[in-house]
Every structure is written in C-alpha cells, then in structure tokens.
Regions:
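Helical hairpin unit composed of two closely spaced alpha helices linked by a short loop
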Residues: 393-415, 419, 424
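A general structural signal for well-ordered alpha-helical packing
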Residues: 373, 401, 431-435
C-alpha cells in the first residue's frame, strides 16, 4: 500500500464530533476484548510463558538442590558485600539487603533489572551525548547569573547546580509565567496557543487518551500539519497497555503528524519497563511552553470522573525560558534520530518583559543525579517561614523525609496536601506510613476531601516555587524521566500560594494520632506496614 493510499484510508476513519474534536478510534475499541487481543495480551501471555519455563527448569533439576543452596549462599554473601559498598541511600540499600537474604537469585536478578541499567547502557550513552550537545546551545547569560546572585546567593547556588551537575540548565530572566490551578484552566489557555502556531508544535506526554480533550487538540494539530506546521507527538509506551493501540503512530502520521513512542511495550522481560517518560511538555514555535501535572485525557479536566474531583496544576512560560523546554523535547526525540538542536534552539524568541528568574529543568534516571529530589531538598533547607506542598503521592527516602522533618523542627511551616480519594490504594497505604513520623516533627498534613490531588507544587516562603511533573515518590525521584520549572520572584507566586490556601480550605486536617491517620482502616494499615520495607523496589 502506498503512502498516499494509507493516508487516504486513515483519514477516512477520522470521526468529527459536535465538540469540534476528532477521534481516530471507534467507541469500545479500548475495552477488555480489545486488550486481550492487542499487544497487551500478547505481551502478558509471552511473559507468563517465560516465567513458566524458568519454573519448570527449576523443578526438572531438583536433584541439584544441594548445589543450588550452596551457590545461593555464595551469591548472597557476594551481593551483600557489593550492596554495602555501593553509593546509595540507606533507605534503598536496606530493602535490597532483605530481599537478597530472603531470595538470593531473585534478589540479584531484580537488582540487575532495576539498578544496573542492563539493556540501557546504549540509551544512557546516547542521552549523555545529547545532553553535551544541548549545553553548547543553551549558554548561560552572565548578566542574569550575576543578577540572581545579587538577589539571593542561596538561589544562585541552586542555579549553579542545575547548570553544572544537574544537566546544563541555565537560569533565565524575561520569562512570563502563568499559573493554572486546574487542568480546565490549562486546557482553555492551550487551545488558542495551538491555533497561533506558524512554525512547529512539540508535545511530549506520559498519557494520551482519546476523548474531548485530546480530540480538540488533535483537530488543531491535524489542521496545522496540513498548513505546513511541523507537528510532533511523543508519548510513553505504557499508553499501549491502557489507552492507545499499537498502530496509533501510523494513524497520526496519516494526518501529517510525526509521532514517536518512548520505550514501546515488547513481549520480553526488559529494563525498558523500569524507566518511563513521565514528562509533560508542550512547546509552540519556541515562544510558549506548557508543563505541569496535566496529561491529555478527560479526567484531567474533570470531563469524566474517576476519583472524585481532579485537582491539578500547570504553568505556561512565554519568553527565553521556553528554549530549555524545546531542548528537553528534542533530547528525547533525538534518541534514535539525528539531533536538530541548532535548527530550533538558535531561532530568535520574541522579547518578553517579566519579573523574576526561572529555570526549566529535566531529570534523567540514567545519569546518577537525582535532580528533582535535590531541588526539593534545597528549597526545604533554605526555607525560613513556610514550605507548602501539593502532591499525589508520599513515598519518601531517608534524605527527603529528614529534610521535611528538619525544616519543621526549625520552625518552618511545612504543610502537605495529599488526596482524600487516592487513585492507587497501595500508594495511599504507603503514604500514610510516613504521616506519624512527619506529624511528630511538626509537619502538617491535610487530605483534600473532594477527590484526587495530582498537582506537583512546592512553594517556599512565598518567594520561590517549583511546578512540574515530579512526585514525592521513588518512581519519580529515581526511575522516571521528569521535568519541572523552578521560579523566583515571578508575578504568579501569589497565585500559587492562593491556590494552596483555596485547596487547603477543602481539606481534612490529619491529627498526630493513629485513629486520625488510618481512620480505622486496619487492612490499609496492614498493607502499608507490609509494603514499606520494599517501597523503594515498587
């Protein structure tokens, strides 16, 4: 079939809805039967067959059990010595020691799978190469660096880290930041920006799901692509498990939209499953960029309800700072392609007059730097009056928990808002295991009773804030590709603080008692206790 015939066939399957959006999938195509007979079903069957074959081999060679036991003792000893000499957080080291002691072979295999980047060395090498190329295209304006140092030496030190070991991210002035306290607000602002595109539109999202939100966006993207705008869409491979079929990239390409799937699902055990692209970036012509917690699915704009009301947050950047967001997208897009940094990063950006400083930044799980966590800890350590946080999850390592508690013990008003209606029961149980230690140090915790808080927001002393995709959990801090925006002195900071206070007004205050924390849910309490010692492995 020729390319022209394919495009005609795919376009004939596009359905236009009264809401002005378009759909590429038929209603019901994402149901159980479709899942069973899709790539998801194939992957599941092949994985079960692989593990079944391994189990059968163990039974057939049961007469070698004494030799196996001797070997496992040796493996356990070697692995424990190795773990004790690794540069890792003790809250991560101890669970690995326990798992290795209880199940040596499984522990070693699991460690190699999650920690040693087996199968990811080429990806790691490629990303480091791309990061090096990006640095030269994102020079630091020395005048801006000096201005930040004069304004706040502590913030300048953070900027130095993000520019150096943190990944080569410069600090910018002249960048207007608009804060959106909901997915609906972001969606309303996003559509006219897409309509204004004349050169390119880049989208990188963790989740895309057909419906009102994506349909409206897709209609504009298809129209812009037909007008000659360079439209590119990238989404994480886990969408193939839950929301989109395997051939969805072909469907988009038939509309003139270039598409890439990060780490597609394969029917073999692979470390690709461990590292996911959790970023949410949208860039229009290099002059406007969006990020935050909002994915492209209807629950994020409360068009459909899953866990009560959905509370999210996002920011829109206009001006020089968008250049880094463009670079972050191009890094991921260029993993298997020739990079195009110079083509897009050297274009002039319309001049914008704005107060304050911003640093858009990314976090790569393969470079050995926990950038997202380091930024959070830095804000906690420099806080003098308050640190207000909205987060969907709370699965902490020792360093971040210590930073939260120490800030509160210094007299800082540390206040966290978490969901009253969680999306994952095991994550909810694990979060609650942290409540009492934090509360005992003076940290305040509230739960948003209308529904689920998916926003990732931290505001410090009303002067600095971080809004992005980075959750307070192990997967975000250790295993995901993430991004966020640090900001200081920008005009939207009072709006961020006001949103925190508005959200707090709808919360239940958690008191420092077991009854207040667990609310009599004994099974949830038991699950939290059982899961906590392996939390870093989840």
């Amino acid at each position: 079939m020729s390319k022209e015939t394919l495009q005609h066939t795919m376009r004939s399957k596009v359905r236009v809805f009264e809401d002005g959006g378009i759909r590429l999938l038929r209603k019901g195509q994402k149901g159980l039967i479709h899942a069973i007979f899709s790539r998801f079903g194939l992957v599941l069957v092949l994985l079960v067959l692989q593990f079944g074959a391994l189990f059968s081999l163990m039974r057939w060679f049961s007469d070698l059990l004494p030799h196996y036991l001797g070997g496992t003792l040796l493996v356990t000893a070697v692995m424990m010595v190795y773990l004790l000499n690794q540069d890792m957080n003790n809250s991560v080291r101890i669970p690995w020691l326990v798992v290795t002691a209880l199940a040596p072979v499984l522990g070693v295999l699991l460690f190699c799978y999650t920690k040693e980047d087996v199968g990811h060395r080429m990806l790691k090498k490629r990303l480091l190469e791309l990061e090096g190329q990006t640095r030269s295209q994102l020079p630091q304006n020395k005048k801006t660096g000096k201005a930040l140092d004069a304004d706040c030496p502590g913030a300048a030190s953070l900027a130095q880290y993000l520019r150096g070991r943190g990944g080569g991210f410069p600090v910018y002035e002249n960048t207007q930041v608009t804060y959106f306290p909901s997915g609906e607000a972001k969606f309303a602002a996003l559509l006219p920006q897409l309509e204004s595109a004349t050169q390119y539109i880049f989208l990188e999202y963790f989740i895309i799901d057909e419906g009102l939100m994506w349909g409206r966006i897709l209609e504009i993207l298809a129209r812009k692509a037909a007008q000659g705008v360079d439209v590119r869409v990238m989404y994480d491979g886990t969408c193939e498990f839950s929301t989109l079929p395997r051939d969805y990239p072909r469907r988009l390409e038939a509309l003139g939209i270039r598409c890439k799937v990060f780490a597609p699902v394969t029917p073999f055990v692979s470390t690709h499953y461990n590292y996911r692209d959790h970023r949410k970036i949208l860039v229009v012509d290099g002059r406007v960029g969006f990020t935050g917690g909002v994915n492209l699915a209807d629950e994020y704009i409360n068009h459909i309800e899953k866990y009560g009301r959905w509370k999210d947050a996002a920011v829109m950047l206009e001006g020089e700072g968008v250049r880094t967001m463009t670079a972050l997208f191009l890094q991921m897009w260029s993993i298997q392609r020739e990079p195009e940094f110079a083509q897009f990063l050297t274009r002039p950006i319309p001049e914008t007059q704005a107060n304050g400083f911003v640093i858009p930044y990314g976090d790569c799980p393969l470079d050995g730097e926990r950038v997202g966590e380091m930024v959070y800890i830095d804000l906690l350590n420099r806080a003098r009056r308050s640190v207000h946080i909205i987060t969907p999850y709370l699965i902490l390592d020792g360093e971040l928990e210590t930073a939260l508690r120490f800030a509160a013990e210094r007299g800082v008003d540390v206040h966290l808002i978490l969901p009253g209606k969680p999306d994952k029961w095991f994550a909810y149980a694990l979060a609650k295991t942290h409540y009492l230690p934090l509360l005992s140090s003076g940290v305040k915790i509230s739960e948003w009773t209308p529904g689920f808080t998916h926003a990732k927001v931290m505001i410090m002393d009303g002067q600095e804030a971080v809004v992005g995709t980075i959750n307070l959990d192990y997967r975000s801090l250790y295993h995901h590709f993430e991004n966020a925006v640090w900001m200081r002195g920008v005009d939207c900071l009072p709006r961020i603080e006001a949103d925190f206070q508005d959200t707090l007004a709808q919360c239940r205050t958690v008191e420092p008692t077991r009854q207040s924390v667990w609310q009599g849910k004994k099974l949830l309490h038991l699950v939290g206790i059982m899961l906590k010692f392996i939390a870093p492995l989840i």
